[in-house]
Amino acid sequence: MAGQPAATGSPSADKDGMEPNVVARISQWADDHLRLVRNISTGMAIAGIMLLLRSIRLTSKFTSSSDIPVEFIRRNVKLRGRLRRITENGLEIEHIPITLPIIASLRKEPRGALLVKLAGVELAETGKAWLQKELKPSQLLWFQLLGKENSALFCYLLVSKGGYFSVNLNEEILRRGLGKTVLVKGLKYDSKIYWTVHRNLLKAELTALKKGEGIWKEDSEKESYLEKFKDSWREIWKKDSFLKTTGSDFSLKKESYYEKLKRTYEIWKDNMNNCSLILKFRELISRINFRRKG
């Protein structure tokens, strides 16, 4: 009796045989359409980057203070802009967002400018004249968000002076005796940079006071400064160990008080790095961190 014919192969063997064929066909198709595959990959990468940038608002153009996320101000993000004009109320700056050629060609950017004020600085008339001379129309600059009040933004202004270096206009004005320090409006007491900002502004002002620059040429101005310092900054200096060691000895005598301030500021180092390359990197890191926690 003849036996039944042997099976030609098991189902698992057929399946294993088909898998290499499918992979080979896909690989062959990809080789035959290499340009199409590259274009698809590039398109997907660009789409992903565009979605990421839009989600953290890197490509958004801000035309008013209400457009800026509260988180940006809380994190003191640095933005780039172009000066339009200087008015009695402050500087009108057109925000320049990060743009991609594809996005820029497809959409129309909104028109408008931000009202920016020098944080912690009360400009003298000579200071306003100096700003008009120093800043040119359409000049590019960076502004670091420190606080907001109504439609005005209180910022650090940084202007490139060639190469990778920038000048902090807030501190430069005080250093030249072209204005006086005031509390930065909108900057929270619990902010990490609250004390650093005010300390640097005071240090710049004391430099002008010591050299008798600008408004500090007259002794009467120096005396009024000391009175103002006592009334307006006592709360800030309570946070410093200097006052803790001196206790109630808060003398406003010109020589002794100035020497105490001088010794105190010699301890501190200027932590503000005005390298524009570093500012660009810090802005990107700030926004990436904002995206991660959002």
Curated annotation (Swiss-Prot):
Highest taxon, organism lineage: Eukaryota
Tissues with expression: Highly expressed in ileocecal tissue and endometrium.
User: What name is this protein filed under?
Assistant: Protein C3orf33
Q: Which PANTHER family match?
A: PROTEIN C3ORF33 (PTHR28434:SF1)
Which residue windows are transmembrane per the record?
A: 40-56
**Gene from which this protein is expressed:** C3orf33
Keywords of this entry: Acetylation, Membrane, Secreted, Transmembrane, Transmembrane helix
Task: Tell me where in this chain the PTM N-acetylalanine is found.
Answer: A2
Any S-S bridges, and between which cysteines? Answer: none
Gene Ontology CC annotation, any one: extracellular space
> InterPro entries under this entry?
C3orf33-like (IPR042421), SNase_OB-fold_sf (IPR035437)
Keyword Transmembrane applies: yes
**Entry keyword Transmembrane helix:** yes
| Biological process, per Gene Ontology | negative regulation of ERK1 and ERK2 cascade; regulation of DNA-binding transcription factor activity
